[in-house]
């Protein structure tokens, strides 16, 4: 039964990560909306940028922890067949993290450029 409790806890953590990603996207949308105004409010933009950065760091940290856990579980168990699927899933997760980092960096650069414009 303890296995189900641990699995449920992991699923809850992933759901929380998903909610945090949704908040990141909402935050990015708010920044873009604010930047589209004729006279953007710098205080609002600074607050949004701070929230955005903090959320991205939390997601990155939590996802890294989840991936570390999956790696330990996949390699710490006696051989029960092919580990190809687990390796593929891990690789795909890392690729998604890298892609998210690239897109977030692009968004950050765009926000910085918009803030620098007179």
Curated annotation (Swiss-Prot):
Chain coiled-coil ranges: none
One GO cellular component term: mediator complex
Chief localisation class: nucleus
Pfam families: Med11
Quaternary structure (record): Component of the Mediator complex.
Molecular function, one GO term: transcription coregulator activity
Annotated family: Belongs to the Mediator complex subunit 11 family.
GO biological process terms on file: regulation of transcription by RNA polymerase II
Annotated InterPro entries: Mediator_Med11
Keywords associated with the record: Activator, Nucleus, Transcription, Transcription regulation
Compartments (UniProt record): Nucleus
Name this polypeptide is given: Mediator of RNA polymerase II transcription subunit 11
Protein's job: Component of the Mediator complex, a coactivator involved in the regulated transcription of nearly all RNA polymerase II-dependent genes. Mediator functions as a bridge to convey information from gene-specific regulatory proteins to the basal RNA polymerase II transcription machinery. Mediator is recruited to promoters by direct interactions with regulatory proteins and serves as a scaffold for the assembly of a functional pre-initiation complex with RNA polymerase II and the general transcription factors.
């Amino acid at each position: 039964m303890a296995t189900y409790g641990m699995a449920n806890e992991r699923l809850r953590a992933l759901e929380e990560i998903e909610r945090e990603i949704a908040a990141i996207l909402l935050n990015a949308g708010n920044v873009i909306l604010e930047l589209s105004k004729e006279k953007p409010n710098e205080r609002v933009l600074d607050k949004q940028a701070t929230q955005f950065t903090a959320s991205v760091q939390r997601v990155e940290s939590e996802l890294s922890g989840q991936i570390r856990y999956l790696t330990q579980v996949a390699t710490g168990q006696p051989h029960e067949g092919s580990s190809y699927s687990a390796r593929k899933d891990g690789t795909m997760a890392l690729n998604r993290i890298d892609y998210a980092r690239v897109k977030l960096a692009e968004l950050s650069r765009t926000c910085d450029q918009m803030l620098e414009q007179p």
